Curated annotation (Swiss-Prot):
GO terms for cellular component: cytoplasm. The N-terminal region contains the highly conserved SGGXDS motif, predicted to be a P-loop motif involved in ATP binding. It comes from Rickettsia peacockii (strain Rustic). Ligates lysine onto the cytidine present at position 34 of the AUA codon-specific tRNA(Ile) that contains the anticodon CAU, in an ATP-dependent manner. Cytidine is converted to lysidine, thus changing the amino acid specificity of the tRNA from methionine to isoleucine. PANTHER family: TRNA(ILE)-LYSIDINE SYNTHASE-RELATED. Belongs to the tRNA(Ile)-lysidine synthase family. Pfam families: ATP_bind_3 (PF01171). This is tRNA(Ile)-lysidine synthase. Keywords: ATP-binding, Cytoplasm, Ligase, Nucleotide-binding, tRNA processing. Gene3D superfamilies: HUPs (3.40.50.620). Its EC number is 6.3.4.19. It is an enzyme of class 6 (ligase). It catalyses: cytidine(34) in tRNA(Ile2) + L-lysine + ATP = lysidine(34) in tRNA(Ile2) + AMP + diphosphate + H(+).
Amino acid sequence: MLYEKFEYNINNLIGNFGLSKMSIAVSGGSDSVALLYLANIWAEKNNIELFVISVDHNLREQSKQETHYIQNISNSLNRKHYSLSFDHQNNFSNLQERAREGRYDLMTNLCLELDILVLLTAHHEDDYVENFCLRLERNSGIFGLSSSNINWYNNIHIIRPLYNIPKSELVEYLVSHNIKWFEDESNSSDKYRRNVIRQKLAKGADYIRHFSKPVYREEFKGDTERSTAAYTSVGEEALLRGPVKLTVSSRGLTTVKTIKSTNNFSIFNWIPWSSHGMTEVKLIHATMPREDASTGTASKLSLEAKCGKMSKAAIISQQLKTNKRIENEFKPELISAIAEAVKIFEYGFAFLDLVKFDKFSNEVKVQIINFLLIIISGQSRAARFYSVEPILKLITQDVNFKNTLHGCIIKRIQNELLIYREFGKKLPESKILLDKSVIWDNRFCITKNQETPNCFVTHLSLKDYKIIKKQLDLEPLKNLSCKNHNAVLLTLPIIKILEKVIAIPHISYYDNDMWNFEVSFSPNFVSRFTHFC
């Protein structure tokens, strides 16, 4: 029975989360409508309040009909419905990616407003198969080819309980219960490669891979074959048997110890730094059987995949093997690499220990660089491999350098890599402090502890810096950043009233004793492998 399979999935994915409410993304298509009815049954059984969210992308005439239909279903199920609207601003370049990002921004921001931690989405087995094929054609490494049923976006837990259920079962469920849904006409267009793959697999035909030029060059190959190393800093036993806790101060990572697991999923949970004192980082990973962890066989694509012809069953099998190797080998290595080689500071910059970094596999090296670029830049998408590859090559040359990438300055200083924010031509938007707290530049959370009229958060301009520089104590920042304090200072949030700088909380600068602000480094991080919030 479909519901029993769904119930088993969602119970395993959520675990003992202690939820009283959750949200669900519903578009009007067969997948999400089926998910809505299944989730409604489960929510009733578990006494959970379910909030239904629809996003109108304003691209199709029938989209408003779909939203109205979902609202009617929600009302009939006695569930609250929220209709959101994506503004494409008549910009149709890279529209699919922008629409997806905009959709998740809208939905997760609403979840934060409603104090909801979990968002259900209707990604099903066929979606995972299509994604695998598309990533294979893009020459993705093993991390790119893997899939996850649990993701994080904007610190919201994205759960996909239909991951092992084919679309045909969802359609059959709707038909048998006389439930209507909408078909998106664009899904039948040959314009998109995904649709071509979908149509072939739906007819039971084999997937024929489109080969593109190799992304991995001879100088730097991903998915290297190697035996599993002992992770000395954290300890292999700790990584394989359970999660670890990292204690953090303003000087970076200091201690590591094993803690008890809370769920069956992997997260890198960063409780943001306060501008005063110390806090913790919880580094958690799911434990899985160690069989095959040291053989490396799971990472090898099947002969069918290499030849470019696979059945749907073969694709699913290859996906499972890939996922297993990620869980057994690469994810523990990634966790170990972050614990050993990375230091992230409350000022929004990071150092990477290149001596320790060098011992990890190339696939993990790419993930670490992207991990840092996303955190420091505040962006929600990772850099492409072809952009990261030159940095990795420079690192191997053992010479100091300074480059820009993905909204960051990357600077080698002897055996360390310093990464800090670069504004470039696109300066961060100023934010008015109307509420008690505000997120600025997708990185910092600023909280006011008193009523402050007409103040706003922005960055420090050179003009303002010249006016107040003699009043600033930059010695701590200077020491921590290896004398890059001036560059880092210009990336920090400041509070102004009209044209006057009244506070720079990071360096404890206040022009008046009455002001009191707190700041924490809390970027909107997106990952299938690690997370912090």
